């Protein structure tokens, strides 16, 4: 073996000595030690054969592309067997190869066993077969998929002399280039489709997103390798039908996402599951961030939230999406605004990195426990600009500047990935330069943070792009070593501790009753105190199980006999239930709320005390309120007059603690007489008690001290005692199971406490961050003062910076002050009190105004009614002409008729009188209605005053009851002290009895102790009954308060109805005024027309008399005059007739229109 080791060391110092040879030598040594070697010559021959079969590599790996961990050689078991990497040079090689770090995951591949040595040649093929067969590998945090772009026509023409592709797919998850094999999660060759890429990367991303994980997809590669096509597809495919085969990864992801959202919502309809998706689209061009959804020339800035340590882009447009069509529209808009340019390598080259982000928030509610769950996940789809070389792209000007920024950004990304890979492999912490570029700073969660990362590395198979393809594959290999820490982003809002919450609410209610009870007469009682809420809190507190505090004892098991009858009674009373009363009590008091049962208290050996349970019956609302109040008052008076009540130094604890049932030491004494067993108060527990405690107990300490004791075989003939022994054994076994279950419950409670402590830690962390910001401003101020003292900073600039710093500090302190919970609570309380005061003032002012308006309307109505009769007597009766009746006719000498219409004023006046009478009747009805409503309002006011007085009295009684209830809780300490003393005395008696044995004198002493304990038990039961009666009285008072509150609401409703009636009366008054005004105007118009009509008749009669005299003295007339008369007659009659006709017709029509 020494010869073999010497040759191994010489091989390490030779030209071909590398780590695999040393490992193979160690393998040979292990084989030689496992079985007797045939000789040193055989071992040396095997070593020389292994060295001869392994050809050396001719190619060195560039130092910047070496894996961040230790770089094994080409034929190491760490690499694929077909690798042909060149060994390390002499200057990098020492006596021993560098030891890989202990946390290097590649060490798992090393196996120096004989089986591993035999199968070392097919290791890579087996790994590839396992990956291809669908066997899930351990999740490394980063999924790397390589996609080989099919060669284009130009590349086929250029590579006509060398038709072989530079990279080829050798397995489902490995590729080969220049004799080197690279293994990844999956490899998509030239014939792969967009659907294949979506199945490899998109489907897991959607499922991770719905599970609450942050997920990211990076597309990396050289320019023209198909990154943009893979991520988005052509723009024509986005605007076409969704069945287009060229659609990219992003639209397919969101189509699947919305489909799964609908499926989840249909599956969890009972949880009220809702989803909200918010998308944004940005690009990084020449280290400047712009918004693709809002193409403005301004540059956006990256901000970091100091409270949550989240990085975000300020003023970035965010769109809420609901369907795949909405996402497609955003993609089309953003990609059309993205900066692209033409180069010699790519006609449509992307000149910027673009990031499409979608934040998905899901909210669900569990109806069983009332908890709310919120999951938030983020999807980052990143299309990186391709790296390029100037000698291939022939870029100049702006294109050259863009290429420099792109290469610089990708170089910083590669440096970051190298550091992260080194940290993941070595476990040593290093500074991670996230802030070197805006790309890495923006996506730091995806790189080594809380996200699941998938990287699509696009490569070109052309021989001209061989070096870029090799660099991309090495980059992907380094990225595969990164370890992310993805967690589910879920927040659950669980219910708070009901015990503390109810105690706090009851104390607040008591304080509110004491402070605001005397303000109930101001009309705003309902705004300051809610009786229904107080009753609900009281019922919840009474319905919760109540137990005493746990009293631990250090004494061990003592063999004693326990009286079965004395112990069974309190165990049978294991529930305190507020149940409907029986038939007898319903006949006497239908409203009494019966509280049955009591607490199960083991005063002998009970480390824990039996819980009491209350369950409120729904039938208590149907009982009579008055009888219930009377019953409660009687109970309180009886308690005050009872001497035992005053002498009792114990109280009932209504505080809710953990349910910890009792345990009883079950043992057997050697006395077989049944009479002594019946007389002994420390007899065996009945089987019913054992079964009950076995099924109810959940205490981890329950039955801790139970054991089986030896007993005399002579008394086993008693069959009942044998059954008791068997059931005691059953209880011991059940106690073991209960202890295990109780341990689980204790773990749950401790987890809840840990969660509460975590919340406190988060709160303290937030305060520390605020203090850190303030400290940072102080340090900046000190630095500015130093610069000012040194003279490097001008005074004006110092003043400006100091002012800005102080403004920022003031803003931080203002936010801290405004967000203080005490300040917010005080502001809310002040606003509530101001609103109540304003309501009271408005109510008083409106009441006074309404009363004044009612008085004015009453006086105005009285005046109108009294004046209408006098006005009607003063006006003469008028007649209106309808122009349709017969009229007197006068004939002139030419046969013309003059018709004069006589207006019928009496008929019109009768109509007006009828209308006035109707209005008077309606007015009287309104007056009676107002009087009735006024009387109702007065009665409601009286009722309201009575209700307020009763409510005040009930409030005072309720406050006294609550004080008594609180006093009972405080007096529970006295009960615990008394119980401890009793238990110590019993323990002393047990110890003495165990030492001396149970004999006549000792038995009588024990009997006397049992009598005292029975008295104490009876007193305890009386206290429980008193507490039940108190609870009954409290509930009755609560019911009274609720009824009084409802009466107050009815009073408010009656007041609103009275207000509506007054408004209707006011409207009636307004209608009467309008009718009177119209009536006055019509009367004046009719008088004027009557005077004009009489004057017109007189004028007409005078004209007709003149015409008759002229006709009498005229002769036959001249021919001209005769001709004029004929022409006038042909035109339609004489002048007088036409005039008279026109006047009559106009007056008649006018009268018709107006009447």
From Swiss-Prot:
Residues 349-353, 382-388, 431-435 are annotated as: Microtubules-binding. GO terms for cellular component: cytoplasm; kinesin complex; microtubule; phragmoplast. GO terms for molecular function: ATP binding; ATP hydrolysis activity; microtubule binding; plus-end-directed microtubule motor activity. It is found in: Cytoplasm, Cytoskeleton, Phragmoplast. Residues 47-61 have a biased composition (Basic residues). Residues 47-117 are annotated as: Disordered. ATP binds at residues 221-228. SUPFAM superfamilies: P-loop containing nucleoside triphosphate hydrolases. Residues 141-482 form the Kinesin motor domain. Pfam families: Kinesin (PF00225). Keywords: ATP-binding, Coiled coil, Cytoplasm, Cytoskeleton, Microtubule, Motor protein, Nucleotide-binding. It comes from the Eukaryota. Residues 87-96 have a biased composition (Low complexity). Residues 823-861, 934-971, 1006-1089 form a coiled coil. The keyword Coiled coil applies. Its main location: cytoplasm. Gene3D superfamilies: Kinesin motor domain. PANTHER family: KINESIN-LIKE PROTEIN, KINESIN-LIKE PROTEIN KIN-12D. Plus-end directed kinesin-like motor enzyme that plays a critical role in the organization of phragmoplast microtubules during cytokinesis. Belongs to the TRAFAC class myosin-kinesin ATPase superfamily. Kinesin family. KIN-12 subfamily. This is Kinesin-like protein KIN-12A. It comes from Oryza sativa subsp. japonica.
């Amino acid at each position: 073996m020494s010869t073999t080791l010497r040759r191994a060391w010489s091989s390490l110092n030779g030209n071909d000595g590398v780590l695999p040879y040393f490992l193979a030598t160690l393998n040979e040594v292990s084989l030689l030690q496992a079985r007797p070697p045939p000789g040193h010559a055989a071992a040396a021959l095997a070593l020389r054969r292994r060295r001869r079969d392994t050809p050396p590599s001719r190619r060195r790996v560039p130092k910047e592309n070496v894996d961040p961990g230790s770089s094994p050689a080409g034929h190491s078991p760490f690499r694929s067997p077909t690798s042909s990497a060149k060994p390390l040079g002499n200057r990098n090689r020492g006596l021993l190869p560098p030891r890989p770090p202990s946390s290097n995951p590649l060490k798992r591949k090393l196996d120096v066993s004989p089986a591993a040595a035999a199968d070392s040649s097919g290791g890579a093929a087996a790994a590839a077969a396992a990956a291809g067969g669908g066997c899930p590998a351990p999740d490394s945090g980063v999924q790397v998929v390589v996609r080989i772009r099919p060669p284009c026509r130009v590349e086929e023409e250029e590579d006509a002399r060398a038709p072989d592709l530079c990279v080829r797919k050798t397995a489902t998850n490995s590729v080969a280039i220049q004799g080197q094999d690279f293994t990844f999660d999956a490899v998509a060759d030239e014939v792969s489709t967009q659907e294949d890429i979506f199945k490899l990367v998109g489907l897991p991303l959607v499922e991770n997103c719905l599970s609450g994980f942050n997920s990211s997809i990076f597309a990396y590669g050289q320019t023209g390798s198909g990154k943009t096509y893979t991520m988005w597809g052509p723009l024509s495919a986005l605007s076409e039908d969704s069945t287009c085969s060229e659609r990219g990864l992003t639209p397919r992801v969101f189509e699947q996402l919305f489909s799964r959202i609908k499926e989840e919502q249909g599956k969890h309809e009972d949880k009220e599951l809702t989803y909200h998706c918010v998308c944004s689209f940005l690009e990084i061009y020449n280290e400047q961030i712009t918004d693709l959804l809002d193409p403005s020339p301004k540059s956006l800035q990256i901000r970091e939230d100091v409270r949550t340590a989240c990085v975000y882009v300020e003023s970035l447009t965010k769109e809420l999406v609901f369907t795949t069509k909405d996402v497609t529209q955003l993609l089309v808009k953003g990609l059309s605004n993205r900066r692209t340019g033409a180069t010699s390598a790519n006609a449509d080259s992307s000149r910027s990195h673009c990031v499409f982000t979608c934040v998905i928030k899901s909210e669900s509610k569990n109806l069983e426990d009332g908890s709310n769950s919120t999951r938030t996940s983020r999807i980052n789809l990143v299309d990186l600009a391709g790296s390029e070389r100037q000698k291939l792209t022939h870029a100049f000007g702006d294109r050259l500047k863009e290429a420099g920024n792109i290469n610089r950004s990708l170089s910083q990304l590669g440096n970051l990935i190298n550091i992260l890979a080194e940290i993941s492999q070595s476990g040593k912490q290093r500074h991670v330069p996230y802030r070197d570029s805006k790309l890495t700073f923006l996506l730091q969660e995806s790189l080594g943070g809380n996200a699941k990362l998938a990287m699509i590395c696009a490569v070109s198979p052309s021989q001209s792009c061989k070096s870029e393809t090799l660099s991309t594959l090495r980059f992907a290999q380094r990225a595969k070593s990164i370890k992310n820490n993805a967690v589910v982003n879920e927040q659950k809002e669980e219910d708070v501790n009901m015990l503390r919450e109810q105690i706090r609410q009851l104390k607040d209610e008591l304080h509110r009753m004491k402070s605001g009870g005397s303000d109930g007469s101001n009309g705003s009682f309902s705004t300051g105190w809610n009786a229904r809420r107080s009753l609900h809190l009281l019922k919840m507190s009474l319905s919760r199980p109540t137990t005493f505090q746990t009293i631990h004892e250090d004494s061990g098991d003592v063999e004693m006999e326990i009286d079965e009858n004395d112990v069974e009674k309190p165990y049978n009373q294991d529930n305190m239930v507020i149940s409907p009363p029986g038939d007898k009590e319903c006949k006497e008091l239908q409203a009494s709320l019966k509280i049955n049962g009591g607490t199960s208290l083991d005063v002998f050996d009970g480390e824990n005390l039996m819980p009491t349970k209350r369950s409120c019956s729904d039938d208590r609302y149907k009982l009579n309120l008055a009888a219930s109040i009377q019953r409660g008052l009687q109970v309180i008076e009886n308690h005050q007059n009872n001497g035992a009540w005053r002498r009792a130094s114990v109280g009932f604890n209504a505080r809710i603690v953990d349910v910890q049932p009792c345990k009883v030491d079950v043992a057997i004494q050697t006395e077989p007489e049944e009479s002594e067993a019946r007389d002994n108060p420390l007899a065996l527990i009945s089987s019913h008690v054992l079964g009950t405690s076995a099924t109810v107990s959940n205490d981890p300490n329950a039955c801790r001290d139970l054991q089986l004791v030896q007993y005399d075989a002579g008394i086993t003939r008693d069959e009942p005692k044998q059954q008791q022994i068997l059931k005691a054994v059953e209880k011991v076994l059940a106690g073991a199971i209960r202890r295990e279950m109780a341990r689980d419950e204790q773990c749950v409670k401790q987890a809840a406490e840990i969660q509460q402590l975590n919340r406190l830690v988060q709160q303290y962390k937030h305060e520390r961050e605020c203090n850190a910001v303030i400290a940072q401003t102080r340090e900046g101020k000190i630095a500015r003062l130093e610069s000012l003292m040194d003279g490097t900073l001008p005074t004006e600039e110092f003043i400006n910076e100091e002012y800005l710093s102080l403004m920022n500090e003031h803003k931080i302190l203002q936010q801290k002050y405004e967000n203080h919970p005490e300040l917010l609570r005080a502001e809310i309380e002040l606003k509530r009190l101001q609103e109540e005061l304003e309501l009271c003032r408005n109510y008083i002012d409106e009441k006074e105004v309404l009363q004044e308006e009612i008085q004015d309307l009453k006086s105005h109505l009285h005046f109108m009614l009294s004046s209408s009769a006098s006005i009607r007597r003063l006006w003469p009766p008028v007649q209106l002409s309808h122009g349709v009746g017969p009229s007197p006719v006068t004939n002139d000498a030419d046969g013309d008729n003059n018709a004069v219409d006589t207006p019928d004023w009496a008929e019109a006046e009768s109509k007006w009188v009828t209308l006035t009478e109707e209005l008077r009747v309606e007015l009287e009805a309104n007056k009676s209605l107002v009087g009735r409503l006024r009387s109702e309002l007065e009665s409601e006011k009286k009722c309201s005053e009575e209700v307020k007085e009763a409510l005040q009295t009930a409030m005072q009684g309720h406050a006294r009851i609550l004080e008594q209830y609180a006093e009972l809780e405080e007096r529970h300490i006295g009960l615990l002290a008394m119980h401890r003393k009793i238990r110590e005395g019993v323990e002393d008696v047990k110890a003495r009895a165990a030492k001396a044995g149970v004999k006549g004198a000792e038995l009588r002493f024990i009997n006397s102790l049992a009598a005292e304990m029975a008295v104490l038990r009876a007193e305890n039961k009386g206290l429980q009954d008193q507490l039940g009666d108190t609870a009954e009285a409290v509930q009755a008072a609560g019911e009274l308060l609720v009824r009084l509150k409802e009466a107050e609401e009815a009073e408010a409703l009656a007041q609103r109805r009275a207000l509506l009636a007054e408004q209707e009366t006011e409207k009636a008054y307004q209608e009467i005024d309008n009718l009177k005004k119209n009536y006055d105007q019509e009367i004046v118009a009719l008088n004027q027309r009557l005077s004009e009509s009489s004057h017109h008749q007189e004028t007409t009669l005078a004209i007709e008399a003149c015409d008759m005299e002229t006709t009498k003295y005229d002769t036959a007339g001249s021919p001209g005059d005769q001709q004029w008369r004929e022409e006038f007659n042909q035109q339609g009659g004489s002048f007088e007739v036409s005039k008279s006709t026109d006047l009559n017709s106009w007056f008649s029509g006018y009268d018709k229109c107006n009447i």
